UniProtKB/Swiss-Prot annotation:
The gene is def. This is Peptide deformylase. Removes the formyl group from the N-terminal Met of newly synthesized proteins. Requires at least a dipeptide for an efficient rate of reaction. N-terminal L-methionine is a prerequisite for activity but the enzyme has broad specificity at other positions. The active site is at E137. It comes from the Bacteria.
């Protein structure tokens, strides 16, 4: 299972809306395995397929924080059924926006209908960290980033920083 390269801001692919997975088959299951390996390697708790350049409505999450007892979720074609009125503030980061963390307010609980790794339709009710991760990763599938939940001034600052970083990286690669 190969580790996939992560797409990093300001790459415009992160703003694409992902398309539904039509059939869960061995190709999709292999992609799920690759995504999990990539997420674990990057020490993340969630990863959307678009973050490795694949615009499919698919994500993986593992909030267990336990090296020995992993509890991965493979979520295909998620649909949010409801969000609670009660809110929660959680410090978020993103594998596609490395080394940037900020507090984001989101609904504390939600219910999501999705297909699992075998293609079986199921539902999950989640709260706290899992609810935050689900909302964060589903945002990715809709072309949204967690920085879209902060003020425009802060968001523009973050985008400028990552554009500058990408420009410097490209200039350095051109020299080599």
């Amino acid at each position: 299972m190969p580790i996939k390269p992560l797409i990093i801001l300001p790459d415009p692919i992160l703003r694409e809306v992902s398309k539904p997975v039509e059939h869960v088959d061995s190709t999709i299951q292999k992609l799920a395995d690759d995504m999990l390996e990539t997420m674990y390697d990057a020490q993340g708790v969630g990863l959307a397929a678009i973050q490795i350049g694949i615009p499919l409505r698919m994500l993986v999450i593992d909030v267990s924080r336990n090296e020995t007892q992993k509890n991965p979720l493979v979520i295909i074609n998620p649909e949010i059924l409801w969000l609670s009125d009660e809110r929660n503030i959680c410090k978020e980061g993103c594998l596609s926006i490395p080394e940037y963390y900020t507090e984001i307010e989101r609904p504390k609980r939600l219910c999501v209908r999705y297909q699992d790794r075998e293609g079986k339709q199921t539902e999950i009710e989640a709260d706290h960290l899992l609810a935050t991760c689900l909302q964060h990763e589903i945002d990715h599938l809709n072309g949204r980033l967690f920085i879209d939940h902060i003020s425009k001034i802060k968001r523009d600052m973050v985008i400028r920083k990552f554009k500058k970083r990408a420009k410097e990286k490209n200039a350095q690669e051109a020299i080599l």
